[in-house]
Curated annotation (Swiss-Prot):
Enzymatic reactions: alpha-D-glucosamine 1-phosphate = D-glucosamine 6-phosphate
Assigned EC number: 5.4.2.10
Organism field: Halalkalibacterium halodurans (strain ATCC BAA-125 / DSM 18197 / FERM 7344 / JCM 9153 / C-125)
Cofactor: Mg(2+)
Protein's name according to its UniProt entry: Phosphoglucosamine mutase
Length: 447
């Protein structure tokens, strides 16, 4: 990754790392790079519910206007909503202000091209190069400056698109929604109510400061309790920008991205919709998933962690379903990025079409016990150069004797080293993780 761009755009603590000054420059330079060959360029901007969103939006808009770009403000909307609308209204580019599932202090700026896909590496590199140079970009004046307008009705256009991806309404299904006090708060309840579902909601009272705070896809235990309390048929949890989905079955069991991918891949294969009989996953997907897919004669392609890598593999190989255990699910026949609400619709639609409860769909295979820990470090990239970390990993793998696996990697978006272990029992998982974590802490230090 570059100096500014990580695996998912530019991220950092708002107002100290991701400052209004940097947002202004990103707007100005990003606007130039993405629209320099366009006539009458326009750029869409959306944001999640973070308190810093308006501050960064103001700076970003100013930068875009200063380069002569028309800006259409979408207001609070999901990341996939921005991706969809960028292509749908033939905009030159789209920008989302969000740090997804990260805490409220963080924020991020992510660009989309006119096709609704994330930027190419070379486009990000061009923006980065210009960020570090003295500003010699054009400075239009008078009537050549950009103008900004609100396009809040864009959200309705996006919801209409989502609704037409399912076969029928959801009458008779009680759905519990957890919107993470984020972008889905004003979207998901309307979407599922319009489809005649009986809905109960939580995490739908954003105040700028409570996004992802004990709610949403990174805290599915809250939704599990809510599903049980409301006696719902299914629970659907989104993250702050609604590009992820984690589900909960009617018994209160958590159904993660791996389970959702299996359910969707199996259904799509049965309906003749799964291109090349292949599912694209990441190295984080559970061993149990691969064994279950093998039994269904569904092939898998494995990528590095990050939905951008899943998408790259899907586009390269001509596949139409892929995703991550964390809940990024990509339905490439419908949209150009992971979409939590679209994934939720497909999952409920499969329940409706098969007449099965979510627990029945999810219980068709068992996951290997898996333990994941995050270690906060001063330099996450040092994990790849350190000698003692690979040594302890090798030691653990020898102890496993082929009955499990280890993955240690730097986070793409936070100052963390992530350690994942799968083994035959939870006790073994915990023991192996602790053994590796002790070495990572000792070698790389903690902030």
């Amino acid at each position: 990754m570059g100096k500014y761009f990580g695996t998912d755009g530019v991220r950092g603590v708002a107002n100290t790392e991701l400052t209004p000054e940097l947002a202004f420059k990103l707007g100005r330079i990003g606007g130039y790079v993405l629209t320099k060959d366009k006539e009458n360029p326009k750029v869409l901007i959306g944001r999640d519910t973070r308190i810093s969103g308006e501050m960064l939006e103001g700076a970003l808009v100013a930068g875009l206007l200063s380069i002569g770009v028309e800006v259409m403000r979408l207001g609070v909307i999901s990341t996939p909503g921005v991706a969809f609308l960028t292509k749908a209204v033939s905009a030159s580019a789209g920008v989302m202000i969000s740090a997804s599932h990260n805490p409220v202090a963080d924020n991020g700026i992510k660009f989309f091209g006119p096709d609704g896909f994330k930027l190419l590496d070379e486009q990000e590199k061009e923006i980065e190069t210009l960020l570090d140079q003295e500003d010699a970009l054009p400075r239009p004046t008078g009537a050549d400056l950009g103008q900004a307008n609100d396009y809040f009705e864009g959200a309705q256009k996006y919801l209409q698109f989502l609704k037409q991806t399912v076969d029928e309404d959801f009458t008779g299904i009680h759905i519990a929604l957890d919107c993470a006090n984020g972008a889905a708060s004003s979207l998901a309840p309307h979407l599922f109510a319009d489809l005649e579902a009986d809905i109960s909601t939580m995490g739908t009272s954003p105040n700028g400061k409570n996004i992802n705070d004990g709610v949403g896809s990174t805290h599915p235990e809250a939704l599990a309790a809510f599903v049980n309390a409301k006696n719902a048929d299914i629970g659907l949890a989104f993250d702050g920008d609604a590009d992820r989905l984690i589900a909960v079955d009617e018994k209160g069991n958590i159904v993660d991205g791996d389970k959702i991918l299996y359910i969707c891949a199996k259904y799509m294969k049965e309906k003749g919709l799964l291109k090349q009989q292949t599912l694209v996953t990441t190295v984080m997907s559970n061993l149990g998933l691969y064994k279950a897919l093998e039994a269904l004669q569904i092939d898998t392609k494995q990528t590095a962690v990050g939905d951008r890598y899943v998408m790259e593999e899907m586009r390269k190989g001509g596949y139409n379903l892929g995703g991550e255990q964390s809940g990024h699910i990509i339905f490439l026949d419908h949209i150009t990025t992971g979409d939590g609400m679209l994934s939720a619709l497909q999952l409920v639609n499969i329940m409706k079409q098969t007449g099965k409860k979510l627990s029945e769909l999810a219980e068709e295979w068992e996951t290997f016990p898996q333990t994941l820990v995050n270690i906060r470090v001063t330099d996450k990239h040092a994990v790849t150069d350190n000698e003692k970390v690979p040594a302890v990993i090798k030691e653990v793998e020898q102890e496993m004797n082929g009955e499990g696996r280890v993955l240690v990697r730097p986070s793409g978006t936070e100052p963390l080293v992530r350690i994942m272990v799968e083994a035959k029992t939870e006790e073994l998982c915990d023991a192996f993780v602790n053994k590796i974590a002790d070495v990572v802490k000792a070698e790389l230090g903690q902030e």
